[in-house]
């Protein structure tokens, strides 16, 4: 069996190597000729899977995408061909949620404000949005949620309209799928008019798709409204973001909010499980066996009181230091293939769960485990 996989997808050999021959390809430049005699295709969001790509590949038995979103997949065409498809909903949700929370922690420390005083507005109540909401709620923030596809009985957090959320929230974090049609389209959801409606000193985070914000309008808006703070992980026109926008952000990264080692492993493992089910094969590997131990095996908290905001940030930086990705992005985003190279070489980040905490003092670890850290109590 010939298994064609994106070169940036981790653990493919470990999981799929026993099922056939693995061939690695550049996902962004993948073409029909690369899929000759392919039985399995494993992609990420940079690959458009459609009739043009697959029309000459008659042996294909399975397509998998290690992503939450599926806007890059022509599922109708796959269904017409009778080709099973699987994606990995929720695989990187924890990573995205923790990214948004860490960005807020970093920015609060930089601005010397108390993050707990901020009202959080989550736009999009899917997997990533709820992961972010969970982090902020564990920290003690008031969280509001906007999602036209949800009803209040489906959510733990107050459900409000977008205009109300913009008026009430101090931090707005975007977690919607990209849609350019229908009554709830999200393409340019934040256009010039909506940007103008932001209240003074709002922090705006985009962790979903670049085109959810009109980036050209955002540049003009930000030049007039320096009180607005931006954290952008996604960009209109990727992999070539508008160069004028990058210096206007507080933190800028190359679409890696969900790029934790755990999230990457989870995505590949979910496709492995789906392929095994599709071909009626036994699942012989485990997710945990793929992950290395964190360089800090266990950390004792000796403090007699609750952690300060600064102490929590220091703890968070042990698993992910956002400043590193921000620095690397600013240095390389405008170089040839710089955006994609940063994504390809992004391997170091872990999730909070990689770090085990124990308390030997009065510091309570329960809320830290709700935040995502592993805990062993006292």
UniProtKB/Swiss-Prot annotation:
Q: Which GO BP annotation is one of this protein's? A: pyridoxine biosynthetic process
Supply the alphabetized keyword list. Cytoplasm, NAD, Oxidoreductase, Pyridoxine biosynthesis
Q: Which domain of life is it from?
A: Bacteria
For this protein, the record's SUPFAM superfamilies field holds:
Formate/glycerate dehydrogenase catalytic domain-like, NAD(P)-binding Rossmann-fold domains
In the Enzyme Commission scheme, what number(s) does this protein have?
A: 1.1.1.290
Kindly give the Gene3D superfamilies that the UniProt entry links to this protein: 3.30.1370.170, NAD(P)-binding Rossmann-like Domain
GO cellular component entries: cytoplasm
Q: Where in the cell is it found?
A: Cytoplasm
Major localisation: cytoplasm
**What is the catalytic activity of this protein?**
4-phospho-D-erythronate + NAD(+) = (R)-3-hydroxy-2-oxo-4-phosphooxybutanoate + NADH + H(+)
- UniProt pathway: Cofactor biosynthesis; pyridoxine 5'-phosphate biosynthesis; pyridoxine 5'-phosphate from D-erythrose 4-phosphate: step 2/5
Does the entry feature the keyword Oxidoreductase, yes or no? yes
**Which positions in this protein are listed as binding NAD(+)?**
147, 233, 258
List the InterPro entries hit by this protein, alphabetically: D-iso_2-hydroxyacid_DH_PdxB, D-isomer_2_OHA_DH_cat_dom, D-isomer_DH_NAD-bd, Erythronate-4-P_DHase, Erythronate-4-P_DHase_dimer, NAD(P)-bd_dom_sf, PdxB_dimer_sf
Q: Keyword NAD on this protein? A: yes
In this chain, substrate is annotated as bound at 45, 67, 259
Could you tell me one molecular function GO term of this UniProt entry? NAD binding
Q: Which residues form the active site?
A: 209, 238, 255 (proton donor)
Functional summary from the UniProt entry: Catalyzes the oxidation of erythronate-4-phosphate to 3-hydroxy-2-oxo-4-phosphonooxybutanoate.
Per the similarity annotation, which family is this?
Belongs to the D-isomer specific 2-hydroxyacid dehydrogenase family. PdxB subfamily.
Q: How does it assemble?
A: Homodimer.
Q: Which HAMAP family match?
A: PdxB
Q: What is this protein called?
A: Erythronate-4-phosphate dehydrogenase
Q: Which organism is it from?
A: Shewanella denitrificans (strain OS217 / ATCC BAA-1090 / DSM 15013)
The gene it comes from is pdxB
């Amino acid at each position: 069996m010939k298994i064609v996989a994106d070169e940036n997808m981790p653990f493919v050999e470990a999981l799929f190597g026993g099922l056939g021959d693995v061939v690695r390809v550049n996902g962004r430049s993948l073409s029909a000729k690369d899929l000759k005699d392919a039985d399995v295709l494993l992609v990420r969001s940079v690959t458009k899977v459609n009739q043009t790509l697959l029309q000459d590949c008659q042996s294909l038995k399975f397509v998998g995408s290690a992503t939450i979103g599926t806007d890059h997949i022509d599922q109708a065409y796959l269904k017409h061909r009778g080709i099973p498809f699987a994606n990995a909903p929720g695989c990187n949700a924890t990573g995205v949620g923790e990214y948004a929370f860490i960005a807020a922690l970093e920015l609060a420390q930089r601005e010397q404000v108390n993050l707990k005083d901020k009202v959080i507005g989550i736009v999009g109540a899917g997997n990533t949005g709820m992961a972010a909401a969970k982090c902020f709620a564990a920290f003690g923030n008031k969280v509001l949620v906007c999602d036209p596809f949800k009803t209040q009985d489906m959510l733990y957090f107050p459900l409000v309209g977008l205009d109300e959320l913009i008026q009430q929230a101090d931090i707005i974090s975007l977690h919607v799928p990209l849609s350019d049609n229908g009554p709830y389209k999200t393409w340019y959801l934040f256009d010039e008019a909506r940007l103008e409606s932001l209240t003074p000193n709002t922090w705006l985070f985009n962790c979903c798709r670049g085109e959810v914000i009109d980036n050209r309008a955002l540049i003009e808006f930000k030049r007039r409204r320096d009180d607005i703070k931006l954290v952008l992980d996604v960009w209109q026109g990727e992999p070539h973001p508008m160069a004028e926008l990058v210096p206007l952000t507080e933190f800028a990264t190359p679409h890696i909010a969900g790029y934790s080692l755990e999230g990457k492993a989870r995505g590949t493992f979910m496709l492995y499980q789906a392929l095994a089910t599709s071909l009626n094969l036994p699942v012989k590997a485990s997710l945990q066996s793929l992950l290395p131990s964190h360089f800090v095996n266990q950390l004792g908290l000796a403090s007699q009181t609750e952690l300060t905001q600064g102490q929590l940030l220091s703890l968070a930086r042990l698993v992910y230091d956002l400043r590193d990705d921000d620095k690397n992005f600013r240095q390389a985003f405008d170089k040839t293939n710089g955006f994609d190279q940063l994504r390809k070489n992004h391997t170091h980040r872990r999730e909070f769960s990689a770090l085990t905490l124990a308390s030997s003092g009065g510091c309570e670890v329960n809320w830290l485990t709700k935040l995502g850290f592993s805990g062993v109590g006292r």
